[in-house]
């Protein structure tokens, strides 16, 4: 078994760290009691895994088997090599695995049994050889006591511990416990049955005492447990190597000093003849450990993060020897620096700088060895690494927290785990990871886990590309150098026809050929089958000689018997000795009929797992004597099966004239070989060898049509001839793959087979059309939105997209990134990165959709997808229209301002600063003055009355806004432009009236026109009443000095007279006219004249009438004007004091009426910078009037300084006074500043609000300071510095301010709504003026602020949902919206998954396209269910997400998010798949090698098997292939039974003897991968009836002597009969076959040499019928169903083993039973002995000797042989032997006799003559009177019977002599002596058995060694009646010769 798996040592320890001990990587679930760390240590033979013991390296990973966890899950064990020993050929490995068990319910506990088990132990073990090993440990989970965790013990031993044979050895098993207070206890393991070494003991402290009695290997397993409750345990399993202690040859020997194991190995020694000297001395001391090597069981603490070292030192007392140290179970990461041996000493240094992850207990074992092969005892010590407070750091005393050693350690984990960006035990920097997530953390491996669409170590290789960029390419190929055909596996992409070359590498000398022979076991005769058996032997020999000597063979059978045939049954797998297999095959029947199933058998054989070797040429040789009769479908299946398995068929029809059907099938296949042969072993073998050579000579390529990608194979290579003289190394062309024109196969797989030589499997990728992904989004009314087109491609090609439908302009427009309308580029394809902008038509609200297709560079998608657009209705802000009006001064001007709103038919108008207009007049609506808060319905009349006439035309802008019904204000401000023009004020005409003129006198009068806005005037005379003698005239001299006679200068005035171009000076134009009259006396109202004045702009004043009175006739005195003293007024203020122009007139008394002041005051020069008005608040200019003429001075606006005006008084005679002037000083005052505050509106989408400015002004140029005196509600107002204004008043540092909305979710009463509010500002100037007042303010100015909340669309982010295959996963869409509670957000599905379903959680109903078109769902309302059996494994790269959907989320207001995608990553959960047969046909009484074949499930990693149950009619075993030692079956005795670590598992099924039938047994099993279990598979076992040979049973025999009874044979086949007798032999024949309906034929195959046989005739006198001879050997069945023969020995002959008679049965199938025989002893007759008694009665007295004479015996047929006699004194009833206390007897001579010690009995053995001499005189003396009998018992010991029955053939005889003993007469008493004697005899009863025993011992002593005797057990009873010495022969009553002697014998 050198090539077999050698298990040396396994230790399984469970380390259950508390939560603080665990170091977890990023993403690992939180630590818990259910997280268990397993540490397993293994030692195995290095050369089982490696080519040499030195080819292994530290750190190498080696797969060893499977560790099961007790919960149905397991993991593959890949141990990391930690140490090795090249000399002893072992390595030590460690495997650490962290297992998470199912969470426990509160206050609960659970126990699991972890196990590492397999077969087989090394076969050279002295105990437990070839047995399974079972290494276990218990896991106890208890969350009641968490985090107090009981850790299992930890131990370590050398894999092989050497001990000295036949000496006491003592060593210690070392173990430690992480729970340092736990006490450990050691014992032999009883966890699993095993045999511990004999002579080995272990105490509870771990001390082992071992005295091995043999040299060799022992295995042991030690159980180590702690004292916790419940306890935790571990086992350590290791090997003890018992060796002979080596010695040294004596120096006197020729090889003195050499190592020896015994004296014989020391040659030519001088002291060889000495009887006391030992030429091989064992005083040879091994090396030993010296200080500072740690002591056994020493605990050595190591510190995390610091270098630690241990010195190991070994010494030998022999300085010339080289010594070394071997260590085992060295912790991973620790290193041993080996020193150089010098002077018999060596030092090694074990060094280790442990990291935090190494916290724990480590037991390391060491031993010394020297160059002479001596080893020290092993020593073990414990390294204990305590958990530091700060793993890879230290505690900072200033903070009390952990400070890590560098940035790579994470302080939040107390420096036990890596920081982000680091991985592994040393927290190395993670490699670059471009498009992925690095596997970080202390348990991470640093690998980059790519996101979908990327690959490569750095995840920087995009998987996507354009189809047009792809060419035919091989993505991956696998070549196996040892295979004939390469590559074996190819993954490729096909765009068009692709020619692929393969290679052949067939050596001239083939070394790998597998041949499976399929034998037809239904042949015409046993002779022909014998030929077939011989041909197999010849075939194997010839193939090995002429083709390949390393060919491996297997064999199987089929039977074409018409009634009981079968298609296929395996015999033995490839690599077996098929010659032995076929020679051991028992044929059930021989028939010449055939069912023609040979082709079906060949198909089944090719489908079976026959143990083919990888890389071998595979052939099946079919040997059949009949042609097949299968139909075309079966032939097609045959061809496909051989192609798919790459097997070459060779068919030999032996003994058949032709096999045309087989020839046709091989021709159809176009490969293989068929021929016929003669029915001889030589020809059959020759034809089979020729066929094998034929299929080996040519490589035929065929496509496997059973694969789903067979249509992709366009052509296969042509046949290739295999060279017989050289290696066939060739590149083969002709294999062309193509893409079928129309295919939808997902992941096609094709296979091309080089028949027999191997095959190439193709995983094919090809371009498939992409799928566009619909999207949906929403856009706000009159806004815009951007979107992209998306899609998926199964081949990850880069996609472009094209629209297939387009929008019309009345709906909206879609533009690309270049702002081009896509509808104008209808054939354009856009990249996936293109961003489109959709702008809906103004106020368009209906849903919109457009369609598009995806293109992968080669193909358009077969369907289009839709972009669905929802336009969200948003409250549109109203708009207003500009307006211009041109009012008329002092005229009510009515106008209408226009505004519009999408929602409101009648929005409102609101002026933002109406004071801008009211400075020029009044602004009213409905009779009420308009303010900034007035809301005026649109289309309503507004009235403006201009009251201020500007000097020049000006445009007054007045801002206003539109406001809708919800208070939303238009974003833009409109302007009402009021065009104010200067209104020409008509002049005011005036003149003094009446005027007086003296009779015949003249008087002047002045036509006055006052006008403030004209430059010249025209006076028009409207009427003239001259009076009778009067005239109105003018003089060209501008005075009244001319008269009518002076016509040249005198002009009379008439109604047509006008005076033009009279300039205004100081707003006054004057025209002097004159009146003259000729009346002599005064006349009142004498004349009159009326006139108007017209300014140069055409306005005419009212008409003024001047009346002329003719008065008096006297001399007038001019009046005197009163001077007004200078005064002062305040700027911009009307003088509050009245001033009067008046005067005095000297001749006032001349007036009529007298004393009336008729003076006229005239303002001759008005003020230049102000006006004089007649009323304090009036507007009528004061020009003249009756004196006293009151007036007020009003300075012009803004004027300050001095002004003056002049004045005079005129009397009624127009006599004017002098003109006086008065100076007015206008003192400056402080003016009120002004501020313009605009209303403001902003939205939630316009940011936080723009900065606004106050427009301030001050007429005096003073600085203006503004304060906010009221703030808006729910809208934050910020000052010039950006600080929130929280209290009022607040002074602004500048004139700017801004607004921000406070938290929109806190708007009341409804969050996320619009807010209308107002704020107020008050500004003051900065002045030094105090009179008449100081600082002035603008007053409170209020403005509106409008915040319009525009609903924000929700947001979402796609993701990946992880779930397992064939499960349903409830998931939640990612969706958020600031306005909408999460529970109210809905999701709209845009596309359904392709490979699964979306289900409604509440109902389980699957969504359809109809559902998703109209319905929305809660974010958590759906679940995903993949289609059955589908997972990521079914994608092109077998790892991409299986499915995806596109979706969008919708808020409460109907706004939708951008669409996104949810991917469904379905973890493959494909259990392993059983690929073998579900029904097996097993031949009756035949072992069936059952191989459970399987394949790893898609995405899986391993295949394990668990046999669940078995119906147990037959026997199911695990078949262990022991290589050259054959196969060993170990019966499965309990279920479930589990195996791991392969994809095929070998079992053996054996039906019970002679049982058969369909559905005979059922084998139930599951395959599993980790915790993933397959369906329950059932293999149905049909046990096929095979004709069984009949059997013979010997029943009985009877001696035909008339008296003998029938004797059953029972357990013997021996007949004892006497000489000259006849025996009748009875036997039966049986056949279990139900088809055996006729009686079996019985024959006598071998006749006895002596005696005669006869048929049985019960009617004959001697029962003998016809003689049975060699020519007539049949024995007919009797009517009772039995067979009888009569045997008659030859007369007068006898002897042991006299004759042997054999019988055989033959069934109707021609099968013979095993031969059964009887052995007959013909014995001579043993003659019974007899007793001769002379005197039968004697009388004597007590204490007197009586001599009994004449007692003799004879045995007629005894001469010199021994006989036995017993002479005893018994009672009258012969029931008890008398005691020696009562009576004694003796012989005159007794050399052959033995006296009983307590009873009156003598036993003698010897020939009869000396015995008779001994009893010639028998002395009897009694001390007790009574009636006695002397008894002689004779036994001939059966010596004349055959020795075999001697013990049963004893004959005997008995004789009696009555002896009456009387008491002396003098002492005679009346008491009955018989009674006394009876009591004496009764007292002696206990001794009877002793007498018999003594007799037996004597007999045995005298018996010859070869004699057979009864055993001592015969004498163990209480009485003698059961003793054969005391019984008559059973034959004595049947034959007079055997009659025993009686009392009357003479």
Swiss-Prot record:
<comment type="function">
    <text>Implicated in cellular adhesion.</text>
</comment>
<keyword id="KW-0245">EGF-like domain</keyword>
<feature type="glycosylation site" description="N-linked (GlcNAc...) asparagine">
    <location>
        <position position="134"/>
    </location>
</feature>
<feature type="glycosylation site" description="N-linked (GlcNAc...) asparagine">
    <location>
        <position position="1374"/>
    </location>
</feature>
<keyword id="KW-1133">Transmembrane helix</keyword>
<feature type="glycosylation site" description="N-linked (GlcNAc...) asparagine">
    <location>
        <position position="1620"/>
    </location>
</feature>
<feature type="topological domain" description="Extracellular">
    <location>
        <begin position="23"/>
        <end position="1875"/>
    </location>
</feature>
<feature type="disulfide bond">
    <location>
        <begin position="450"/>
        <end position="459"/>
    </location>
</feature>
<feature type="glycosylation site" description="N-linked (GlcNAc...) asparagine">
    <location>
        <position position="1662"/>
    </location>
</feature>
<feature type="disulfide bond">
    <location>
        <begin position="433"/>
        <end position="448"/>
    </location>
</feature>
<feature type="transmembrane region" description="Helical">
    <location>
        <begin position="1876"/>
        <end position="1896"/>
    </location>
</feature>
<feature type="topological domain" description="Cytoplasmic">
    <location>
        <begin position="1897"/>
        <end position="1946"/>
    </location>
</feature>
<feature type="glycosylation site" description="N-linked (GlcNAc...) asparagine">
    <location>
        <position position="1852"/>
    </location>
</feature>
<feature type="glycosylation site" description="N-linked (GlcNAc...) asparagine">
    <location>
        <position position="1671"/>
    </location>
</feature>
<feature type="glycosylation site" description="N-linked (GlcNAc...) asparagine">
    <location>
        <position position="1513"/>
    </location>
</feature>
<feature type="glycosylation site" description="N-linked (GlcNAc...) asparagine">
    <location>
        <position position="1743"/>
    </location>
</feature>
<feature type="glycosylation site" description="N-linked (GlcNAc...) asparagine">
    <location>
        <position position="1812"/>
    </location>
</feature>
<feature type="glycosylation site" description="N-linked (GlcNAc...) asparagine">
    <location>
        <position position="1737"/>
    </location>
</feature>
<dbReference type="GO" id="GO:0007155">
    <property type="term" value="P:cell adhesion"/>
</dbReference>
<feature type="glycosylation site" description="N-linked (GlcNAc...) asparagine">
    <location>
        <position position="1873"/>
    </location>
</feature>
<feature type="glycosylation site" description="N-linked (GlcNAc...) asparagine">
    <location>
        <position position="1762"/>
    </location>
</feature>
<dbReference type="InterPro" id="IPR000742">
    <property type="entry name" value="EGF-like_dom"/>
</dbReference>
<feature type="domain" description="EGF-like">
    <location>
        <begin position="423"/>
        <end position="460"/>
    </location>
</feature>
<feature type="glycosylation site" description="N-linked (GlcNAc...) asparagine">
    <location>
        <position position="860"/>
    </location>
</feature>
<feature type="glycosylation site" description="N-linked (GlcNAc...) asparagine">
    <location>
        <position position="1113"/>
    </location>
</feature>
<keyword id="KW-0472">Membrane</keyword>
<dbReference type="InterPro" id="IPR056844">
    <property type="entry name" value="SibA-E_N"/>
</dbReference>
<keyword id="KW-0812">Transmembrane</keyword>
<dbReference type="Pfam" id="PF24907">
    <property type="entry name" value="SIBA-E_N"/>
</dbReference>
<dbReference type="InterPro" id="IPR056847">
    <property type="entry name" value="Ig_SibA-E_2nd"/>
</dbReference>
<keyword id="KW-0130">Cell adhesion</keyword>
<dbReference type="Pfam" id="PF24909">
    <property type="entry name" value="vWA_SIBA-E"/>
</dbReference>
<comment type="subunit">
    <text>Interacts with talA/talin.</text>
</comment>
<dbReference type="Pfam" id="PF24908">
    <property type="entry name" value="Ig_SIBA-E_2nd"/>
</dbReference>
<keyword id="KW-1015">Disulfide bond</keyword>
<feature type="glycosylation site" description="N-linked (GlcNAc...) asparagine">
    <location>
        <position position="705"/>
    </location>
</feature>
<dbReference type="InterPro" id="IPR056851">
    <property type="entry name" value="Ig_SibA-E"/>
</dbReference>
<dbReference type="InterPro" id="IPR036465">
    <property type="entry name" value="vWFA_dom_sf"/>
</dbReference>
<comment type="similarity">
    <text>Belongs to the SIB family.</text>
</comment>
<keyword id="KW-0325">Glycoprotein</keyword>
<feature type="glycosylation site" description="N-linked (GlcNAc...) asparagine">
    <location>
        <position position="1177"/>
    </location>
</feature>
<feature type="glycosylation site" description="N-linked (GlcNAc...) asparagine">
    <location>
        <position position="1611"/>
    </location>
</feature>
């Amino acid at each position: 078994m050198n090539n077999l798996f050698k298990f040396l040592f396994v230790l399984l320890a469970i380390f259950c760290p508390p939560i603080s001990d665990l170091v977890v990587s990023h993403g690992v679930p939180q630590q818990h009691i259910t997280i268990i760390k397993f540490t397993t240590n293994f030692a195995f033979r290095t050369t089982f895994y490696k080519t040499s013991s030195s080819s292994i390296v530290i750190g190498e990973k080696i797969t060893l088997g499977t560790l099961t966890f007790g919960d149905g899950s397991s993991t593959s064990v890949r141990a990391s090599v930690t140490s090795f020993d090249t000399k002893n050929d072992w390595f030590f490995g460690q495997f650490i695995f962290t297992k998470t068990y199912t969470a426990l319910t509160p206050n609960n506990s659970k126990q699991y049994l972890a196990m590492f088990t397999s077969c087989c132990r090394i076969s050279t073990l002295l105990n437990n050889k070839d047995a399974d090993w079972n290494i276990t440990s218990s896991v106890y989970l208890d969350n009641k006591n968490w985090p107090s965790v009981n850790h299992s013990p930890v131990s370590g031993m050398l894999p092989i511990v050497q001990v000295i044979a036949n000496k006491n050895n003592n060593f210690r098993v070392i173990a430690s416990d992480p729970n340092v207070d736990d006490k450990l206890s050691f014992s032999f393991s009883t966890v699993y049955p095993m045999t511990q070494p004999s002579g080995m003991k272990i105490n509870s402290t771990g001390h082992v005492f071992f005295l091995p009695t043999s040299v060799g290997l022992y295995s042991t397993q030690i159980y180590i447990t702690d004292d916790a409750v419940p306890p935790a345990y571990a086992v350590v399993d290791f090997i003890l190597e018992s060796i002979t202690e080596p010695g040294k040859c004596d120096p006197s020997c020729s090889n003195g000093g050499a190592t020896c194991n015994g004296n014989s190995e020391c040659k030519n020694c001088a002291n060889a003849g000495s009887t006391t000297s030992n030429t091989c001395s064992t005083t040879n001391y091994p090396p030993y450990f010296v200080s500072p090597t740690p002591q056994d069981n020493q605990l050595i603490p190591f510190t995390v993060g610091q270098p630690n070292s241990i010195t190991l030192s070994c010494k030998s007392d022999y300085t010339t020897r080289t010594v070394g140290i071997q260590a085992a179970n060295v912790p991973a990461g620790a290193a041993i620096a080996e020193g150089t041996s010098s002077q018999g000493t060596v030092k090694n240094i074990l060094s280790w700088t442990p990291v935090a992850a190494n916290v724990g207990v480590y037991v390391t074992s060491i031993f010394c060895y020297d160059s002479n092969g001596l080893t020290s005892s092993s020593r073990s010590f414990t390294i204990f690494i305590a958990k530091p407070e700060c793993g890879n750091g230290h505690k900072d005393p200033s903070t009390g927290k952990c400070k890590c050693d560098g940035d790579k350690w994470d302080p939040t984990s107390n420096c036990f785990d890596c920081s982000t960006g680091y991985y592994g035990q040393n927290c190395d920097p993670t490699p670059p990871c471009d498009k992925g997530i690095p596997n970080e953390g202390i348990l991470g491996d640093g690998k980059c886990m790519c996101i979908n669409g990327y690959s490569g170590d750095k995840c920087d290789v995009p998987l996507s590309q354009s189809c047009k960029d792809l060419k035919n390419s091989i993505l991956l190929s696998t070549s196996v150098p040892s295979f004939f055909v390469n590559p074996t596996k190819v993954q490729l992409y096909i765009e068009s026809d692709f020619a692929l070359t393969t290679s052949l590498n067939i050596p001239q000398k083939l070394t790998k050929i597998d041949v499976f022979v399929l034998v037809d076991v239904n042949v015409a005769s046993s002779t022909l089958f014998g030929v077939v058996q011989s041909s197999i032997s010849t075939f194997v020999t010839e193939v090995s000689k002429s083709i390949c000597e390393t060919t491996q063979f297997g064999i199987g059978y089929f039977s074409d018997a018409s009634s009981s045939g079968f298609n296929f049954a395996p015999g033995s797998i490839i690599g077996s000795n098929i010659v032995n297999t076929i020679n051991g095959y028992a044929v059930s029947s021989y028939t010449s009929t055939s069912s023609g199933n040979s082709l079906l058998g060949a198909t089944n054989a090719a489908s079976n797992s026959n143990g083919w070797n990888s890389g071998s040429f595979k052939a099946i040789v079919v040997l059949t004597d009949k042609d097949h009769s299968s139909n075309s479908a079966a032939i097609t299946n045959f061809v496909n099966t051989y192609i798919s398995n790459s097997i070459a068929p060779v068919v030999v029809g032996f003994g058949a004239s032709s096999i045309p059907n087989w020839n046709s099938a091989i021709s159809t296949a176009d490969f293989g070989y068929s021929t016929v042969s003669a029915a001889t072993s030589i020809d059959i073998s020759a034809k089979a060898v020729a066929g094998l050579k034929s299929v080996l000579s040519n490589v035929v390529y065929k496509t496997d049509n059973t694969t789903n990608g067979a249509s992709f194979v366009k052509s296969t290579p042509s046949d290739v001839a295999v060279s017989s003289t050289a290696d066939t190394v060739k590149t083969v062309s002709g294999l062309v793959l193509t893409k079928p024109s129309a295919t939808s196969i997902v992941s096609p797989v094709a296979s091309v087979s080089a028949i027999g030589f191997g095959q190439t499997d193709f995983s094919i990728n090809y371009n498939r059309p992409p799928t566009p992904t619909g999207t949906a989004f929403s856009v706000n009314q009159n806004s815009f939105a951007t979107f992209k087109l998306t899609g998926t491609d199964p081949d990850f090609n880069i996609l472009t997209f094209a629209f297939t439908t387009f929008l019309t302009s009345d709906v909206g427009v879609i533009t690309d990134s270049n702002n081009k309308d896509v509808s104008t580029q209808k054939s354009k394809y856009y990249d996936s990165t293109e961003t489109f902008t959709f702008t809906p038509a103004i106020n368009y609200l209906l849903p919109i959709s457009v369609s598009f297709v995806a293109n992968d560079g080669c193909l358009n998608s077969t369907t289009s997808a839709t972009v669905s657009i929802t336009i969200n209705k948003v409250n549109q802000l109203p708009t207003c229209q500009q307006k211009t009006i041109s009012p008329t001064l002092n005229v009510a001007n009515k106008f209408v301002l226009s505004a519009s709103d999408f929602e409101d038919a009648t929005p409102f108008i609101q002026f933002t600063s109406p004071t801008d207009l009211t400075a020029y007049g009044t602004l009213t609506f409905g009779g009420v003055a308009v303010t900034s808060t007035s809301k005026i319905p649109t289309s309503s009349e507004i009235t403006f009355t201009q009251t201020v006439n500007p000097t020049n035309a000006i445009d007054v802008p007045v801002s206003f806004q539109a406001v809708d019904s919800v208070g939303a204000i238009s974003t833009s401000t409109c302007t009402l432009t009021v065009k104010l023009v200067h209104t020409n004020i008509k002049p005011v005409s005036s003149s003094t009236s009446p005027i007086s003129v003296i009779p015949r006198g003249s008087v002047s009068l002045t036509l006055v026109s006052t006008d403030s806005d004209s430059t010249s005037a025209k006076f028009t005379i409207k009427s003239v009443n001259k009076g009778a003698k009067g005239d109105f005239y003018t003089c060209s001299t501008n005075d009244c000095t001319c008269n009518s006679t002076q016509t040249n200068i005198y002009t009379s005035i008439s109604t047509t007279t006008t005076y033009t171009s009279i300039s205004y000076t100081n707003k006054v134009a004057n025209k002097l006219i004159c009146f003259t009259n000729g009346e002599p006396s005064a006349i009142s109202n004498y004349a009159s004249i009326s006139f108007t004045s017209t300014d140069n702009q055409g306005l005419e004043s009212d008409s003024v009438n001047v009346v002329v009175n003719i008065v008096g006739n006297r001399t007038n005195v001019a009046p005197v004007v009163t001077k007004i003293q200078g005064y002062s007024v305040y700027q911009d203020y009307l003088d509050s004091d009245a001033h009067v122009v008046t005067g005095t007139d000297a001749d006032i008394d001349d007036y009529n009426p007298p004393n009336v002041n008729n003076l006229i005051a005239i303002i001759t020069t008005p003020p230049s910078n102000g006006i004089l008005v007649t009323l304090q608040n009036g507007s009528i200019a004061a020009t003249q009037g009756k004196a006293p003429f009151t007036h007020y001075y009003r300075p012009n606006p803004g004027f300050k300084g001095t002004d003056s005006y002049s004045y005079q008084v005129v009397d009624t005679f127009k006599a004017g006074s002098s003109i006086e002037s008065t100076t007015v000083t206008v003192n400056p005052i402080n003016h009120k500043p002004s501020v313009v505050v605009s209303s403001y509106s902003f939205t939630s989408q316009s940011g936080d609000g723009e900065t606004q400015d106050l427009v301030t002004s001050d007429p005096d140029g003073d600085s203006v300071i503004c304060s906010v005196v009221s703030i808006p509600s729910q809208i934050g107002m910020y000052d010039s510095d950006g600080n929130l204004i929280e209290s009022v008043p607040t002074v602004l540092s500048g004139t700017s301010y801004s607004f921000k909305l406070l938290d929109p979710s806190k708007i009341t009463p409804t969050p996320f709504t619009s807010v209308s509010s107002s704020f107020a500002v008050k500004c003051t100037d900065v002045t030094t003026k105090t009179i008449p007042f100081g600082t002035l303010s603008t007053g409170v100015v209020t403005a509106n602020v409008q915040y319009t909340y525009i609903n924000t669309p929700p947001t979402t982010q796609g993701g990946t949902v992880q779930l397992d295959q064939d499960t349903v996963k409830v998931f939640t869409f990612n969706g958020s919206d600031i306005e909408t509670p999460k529970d109210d957000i809905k999701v709209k599905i845009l596309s359904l998954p392709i490979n699964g379903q979306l289900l409604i959680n509440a109902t389980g109903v699957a969504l359809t396209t109809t559902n998703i078109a109209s319905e929305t769902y809660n974010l958590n309302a759906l679940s995903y269910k993949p289609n059955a059996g589908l997972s990521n494994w079914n994608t092109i790269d077998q790892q991409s997400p299986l499915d995806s959907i596109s979706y969008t989320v919708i808020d409460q207001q109907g706004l939708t998010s951008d669409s996104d995608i949810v991917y469904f990553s379905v973890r493959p959960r494909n259990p392993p798949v059983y690929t073998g047969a579900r029904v097996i046909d097993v031949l009756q009484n035949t072992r069936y090698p059952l191989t459970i074949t399987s394949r790893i499930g898609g995405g899986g990693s391993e295949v394990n098997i668990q046999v669940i149950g078995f119906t147990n009619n037959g026997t199911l075993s695990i078949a262990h292939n022991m290589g050259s030692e054959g196969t060993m079956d170990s019966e499965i005795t309990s279920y479930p039974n589990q195996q791991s670590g392969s994809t095929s598992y070998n079992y053996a099924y054996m039906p019970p003897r002679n049982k058969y039938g369909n559905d005979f047994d059922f084998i139930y099993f599951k395959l599993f991968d980790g915790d993933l279990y397959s369906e329950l598979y059932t293999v149905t076992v049909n046990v096929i009836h095979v004709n069984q040979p009949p059997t013979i049973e010997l029943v009985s025999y009877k001696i035909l002597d008339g008296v003998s009874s029938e004797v059953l044979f029972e357990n013997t086949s021996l007949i004892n009969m006497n000489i000259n007798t006849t025996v009748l032999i009875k036997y039966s024949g049986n056949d279990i076959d139900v088809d055996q309906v006729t009686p079996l034929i019985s024959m006598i195959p071998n006749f006895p040499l002596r005696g005669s046989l006869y048929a049985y005739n019960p009617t004959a006198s001697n029962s003998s019928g016809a003689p049975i001879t060699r020519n007539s050997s049949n024995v007919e069945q009797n009517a009772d169903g039995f067979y009888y023969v009569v045997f008659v020995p030859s007369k007068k002959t006898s002897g042991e083993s006299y004759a042997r008679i054999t019988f055989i049965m033959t069934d109707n199938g021609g099968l013979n039973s095993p031969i059964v025989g009887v052995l007959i002893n013909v014995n001579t007759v043993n003659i019974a002995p007899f007793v001769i008694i002379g005197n039968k009665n004697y009388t004597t007295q007590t204490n007197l000797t009586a001599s009994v004479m004449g007692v003799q015996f004879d045995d007629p047929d005894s001469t010199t042989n021994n006989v036995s006699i017993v002479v005893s004194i018994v009672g009258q009833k012969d029931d008890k032997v008398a005691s020696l206390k009562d009576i004694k007897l003796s012989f005159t001579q007794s050399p052959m006799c033995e006296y009983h010690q307590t009873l009156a009995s003598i036993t003698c053995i010897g020939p009869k003559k000396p015995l008779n001499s001994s009893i010639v005189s028998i002395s009897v003396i009694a001390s007790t009177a009574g009636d006695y009998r002397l008894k002689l018992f004779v036994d001939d010991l059966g010596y004349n019977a055959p020795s075999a029955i001697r013990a049963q053939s004893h004959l005997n005889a008995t004789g009696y002599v009555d002896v009456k003993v009387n008491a002396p007469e003098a002492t005679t008493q009346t008491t009955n002596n018989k009674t006394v004697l009876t009591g004496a005899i009764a007292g002696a009863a206990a001794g009877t058995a002793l007498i018999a025993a003594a007799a037996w011992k004597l007999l045995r002593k005298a018996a010859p060694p070869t004699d057979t005797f009864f055993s001592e057990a015969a004498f163990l009873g209480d009485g003698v009646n059961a003793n054969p010495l005391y019984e008559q022969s059973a034959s004595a009553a049947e034959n007079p010769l055997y009659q025993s002697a009686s009392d009357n014998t003479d």
